[in-house]
Amino acid sequence: MPGKLVGSSEEAARTGTQANAHAEDHSDLEHSAPSTDDGFDEPKPPIAKSVPPSTAIPKKNNFKHRGDTKNVKPPTLEEMKELRDTQNLFHSNLFKLQVKEMLEELQLKQKYTDFIENWLESFTVFTRQLKDGLMERTHLEVPMKLSEKPTGFVFSKPTREPYLIGAAATGTLLGPKIVVDVALEMPKESLHKEDYLNLRYDQKRALYLTYVTERMMESQNYAQDQFNFNYYANNPLKPVLELIPVTKQVNKHLQVRLFITAPLSSFKPGRFVPWNNNIRPSFYGDEWDEQDPLPSTQHYNANVLFDLTLSENQAQLDKAFKSRRNFQDGLLLLKVWLRQRQLDIGYSGFGAHILAAFIVYLNKQRILHQSSSSYQVARTVWNQLANTDWTKGISLAVDPIQTEELNKFAKHYDVCFIDFTGQHNLCANIPLYLYQRVREEAKLAVELLNDMKLNSFPLIFMQKCPLYSRVDNILKISNYSCINQMLTLHSQPRIKYDFANYGYPQLLHLLTELLKKGLAERVHSILPLETATAAWPVENKAPVIGKYIQLGLILQPEHAYEVLNKGPAANDDPAGAEEFRRFWGEKSNLRRFQDGSITEAVVWGTAQDSPAKKRLIVRHIVLHLLEHHLQLDSKEVQYIGGELDQVYKLSPWFKVNKLKTKLSLDQDTDAEALSPHVIRCYDELARQLHGLNDLPLEIVSISGVSPIFRYCEPQPVLPQALLVENRILASTIQRVVIQLGQSGKWPTELSALRALKTAFLIEIGEKLEAQCRLHWVISADGLLVLKQGYCFLIELAHNKELALLKQEVTERGITTYVDNAASRFLERQHYILPKVSGALHSLHQTYSAFGSTVLLAKRWLATQLLDDGLWPDMATELLVAHLFQQRYAPQSIAAPQTGFIRFLQLLSHSDFNGELFLLNFNNSWQEQQIADLEHNYRSNRQSYPPLAVATSYDMQHAGRLWTSDQSPSQRVLGHVTRLARRALEIIETSLMSKDLRFVRPAQLFRASNEGYDLVIQFKPDLVPNSLSYDLGSPFVSFSQPNFSLPRAGSDYIARIVGLLRSAYSDFAAFFYNPHGGKELAIVWRPTTEFAAKPFKVTELQACSPSGNGKVQVLKETLLEDFKLLLKDFYLRIATPEELKREQREHQKPMRYFEANQAVAESKPKPKKHGKRKGTGKAAPPKKKRLIKSSTLKALK
């Protein structure tokens, strides 16, 4: 079904038209005109009356004056309501069509409806044939841990026919796996008056279910069906039968769940009120002082009341939803929204039945009306969810509940929503944090609907937003013995009785309370991350669940990474200070602060720590609290947060202590922590440039445009640039664009203007050397300046150069100005990029996780062998910026790992063909401008590149400036989408498994070696390694790193690959890792490109004669051309299979975390013919050969 939903939305998007609409406050819904229309059905055209030809009078004038409306038929009421709803309720026709199309796709097929009716009728006949009897033995396993053997249980035939419950009853079944819930009521005679105590009711319920299941398996009607037991909502006290009918009619797409219930009159009224105790301490062998009141068991009581009140609640829901297509469709919309966010899973899940009851509640409160459209139903529910507080209690009770009683009821639960009977809390098992999360998601949905500049449909209904992608850190505890120890030593008896000794809610309560107190303002929410329990065959024993917990932490970016926890002063609050010391243990110390105060405090780091270290503060706090309070060793816990930060750390092969610099650098540093050093050096250089004396023109603006100035450079930049023989050697250069004051003396000829620009740069270099003692070298790209070990490339921007590039003279001698590739490139680099770079820098100041998220995204794309020529780096930065700008989640991203997961989701689920990614920096685009751009994008989609990204600084180039038809191409875009989906599968499997191990970075940040035809290996000693952490090559094992410094600005491999693509892209695709990759992978184009073709003078590139006047492109000839272009860099060509075979036969595999050991122990591998005669020793390794300067000059 999700696949169908995507398809339907795309179809609606293609057929819809964008229109302006205005939001309307829906608080006045009760004044809307009554109608039975659901708001989506298209109005039927009126039936035209047939007119005889003889009576038809032809019109003499088709252009009558406006006042003549005699022949214009007024719109019908249906049409008027349709138009009003479209104008008032929806963004546009597009949104309405998308919703309508999705609802049509969600409608249950008639064959399923017929099957459900027939199955229920058959099952009703079956239950009538059941007989009373003693259950002495059974070959099935009772799906519950019983305190006594199941002997002597007397089965009583049900006196009430089975009935549908849940979605099947309300007409809101949702695929792709259709689950039909059926209730079978135990007769009152099966229960005794004392069965309310000590799980007796639950055990009888399980036995009753087992007996019915056994009889069904004996029946011929169900002999071929699959029978399994499962726990409803991960609740071990709620076993249900899951039956999968084996029939061609439903083809295993339908499942029946059988619930066993009991009549409400089975026990005395008030027996299960929240303040009563129904599980005695003696049941678990505990002693209890008879003078103390027994603890309440409100959660267990609610568990029993779920069964007892099910019949009455379902009857009321049936009454409210029956024959109301608008309510049903509204609930379907809400269920899709809820499922996409995975808020309805597990013991603490916010189930769809709560939303169904809330719709009825709003209807009773006259907030929602029977005439409301399905869209109004969903919108009103979201709005009321966001703005009402259920912690104080709301009630659906037929007989009104007094406020005092409701408050008394609500005190026993985090969230309180009383059902129709006035006895059961529908939200009994929902923790406060999860309820708050539902409210935040609802509030976000309303905000998205109100945003007229956004098509909110895919964000609300289509995009999957699993809960793990909404959290910043994850805590896993899965050691069975440790959990038992925690529950035994630290779970309070009242909690134990309240949850009937079920471990999971006890763990959830214990950990949530501890972490909430310890993390305080650092954390926004602590959410349980659950997966549905797996069904098991009815012949097997019921599995033990609840001995594993996974919590997601949503952090507050403003406070999460503070290095200090400050406690009360010992003099002012001795008791508070003592409690602070007790809570934090040995971590707490008495400290004096600059304001003179002396208080207890806990210090987790220093203000000078790197951002990566500060992001680990929450981890340190959580692990300390678990160890100090629960005696849980850190080895028994997995705290996931920041594991992927390793990929942009400094390579351990490079030793920082050998670097001559005044900076205090740590060996464990990373690209993020090194960026501020470069920015400070740039700021000082900018001040020196502004302060230069005796320049002919004043420098009016200086802009850093390299990624490092916006914290987006994934490779660590160290102060290691050198001046050697009037040449600057540097691994990276930082680009700076300067603009001068106005002058009318610049030449009007392009080459002369560029010569004058070069002369001006030379003069700036001389002034820098004379006044600031900085070394400089002029190059073809600009002025290279060496400062504090960093190399800056200064470029001079001038408006006249841009105008001269656009200038064209027609045949008639008329001068025109036309955009071309060269002018667009210059305009982007010198005028637009500085503005965008400043905006991205500001974005990083607002969201500290932005820069590091970009680092992860860029490293991932690079390790997938996608360089800037296949996927522009700026496209990555802008897509990540789009994530942080748009409201995809209620809270902003606080951890880069979470940002990276959302980036993968963006790549996986976006409709690149239909979506234009807009970045409205500083809100400088008006709504009308955005609407016009989007309209032009949809109308002329073929004129835009496959990936269209636009910023508010792009002017007339919006959508075409940062990407092109070939970068990324449609094929590359599809390839990246598939890679992102696979990466998400790996991450999700790891995060949601009970295994403590998280994915190793190499699992994500190393490309597959499958699918490539050839691999060209470069000479390792001629290609410098990247300073970033090396995760290995997909083709060859690790080799000795090479950190030699190349000539500044000379990225030879990138230039060679660019030449190969420009010359041979019709015959092959080229892939390499721009971050130090030493292999070039090749994929040949389809064989049709290499077929013989007629001789044509214009199509002879790479061709060889093939006879009969034809020519043909030969792969062997192409390979020789590749070798010629690569020159001295070429080592050899091999297939991936040959490389894999060599690794298996000749080399021991080495993992990335063995790198440090390998440095000390590695020796050159002996070659077959490298042994000295008469000895078994290998010949000494050859010295590294430096590439000759003549070869370098040839590549300039």
Swiss-Prot record:
Q: Where is the composition biased (Basic residues)?
A: 1165-1187
The GO terms describing molecular function are: RNA binding
Q: Which domain of life is it from?
A: Eukaryota
**What Pfam families does the annotation carry?**
Nrap, Nrap_D2, Nrap_D3, Nrap_D4, Nrap_D5, Nrap_D6
A GO BP annotation: tRNA export from nucleus
Identify the keywords attached in UniProt to this record, alphabetized: Chromosome, Nucleus, RNA-binding
Q: Where is this region: Disordered?
A: 1-74, 1140-1196
| Cross-referenced Gene3D superfamilies | 1.10.1410.10, 3.30.70.3030
Alphabetical GO CC annotations of the entry are:
condensed nuclear chromosome; CURI complex; small-subunit processome; UTP-C complex
Q: What compartments host this protein? A: Nucleus, Nucleolus; Chromosome
> Which ranges are annotated Basic and acidic residues under compositional bias?
22-31, 65-74
Mind telling me which InterPro entries this protein's record contains?
A: NOL6/Upt22, Nrap_D1, Nrap_D2, Nrap_D3, Nrap_D4, Nrap_D5, Nrap_D6
Query: What does the UniProt function comment say about this protein?
Result: Part of the small subunit (SSU) processome, first precursor of the small eukaryotic ribosomal subunit. During the assembly of the SSU processome in the nucleolus, many ribosome biogenesis factors, an RNA chaperone and ribosomal proteins associate with the nascent pre-rRNA and work in concert to generate RNA folding, modifications, rearrangements and cleavage as well as targeted degradation of pre-ribosomal RNA by the RNA exosome.
What subunit structure does UniProt give? Part of the small subunit (SSU) processome, composed of more than 70 proteins and the RNA chaperone small nucleolar RNA (snoRNA) U3.
Name the protein family.
Belongs to the NRAP family.
Name of the molecule in the record: Nucleolar protein 6
Q: From which organism does this entry originate?
A: Drosophila simulans
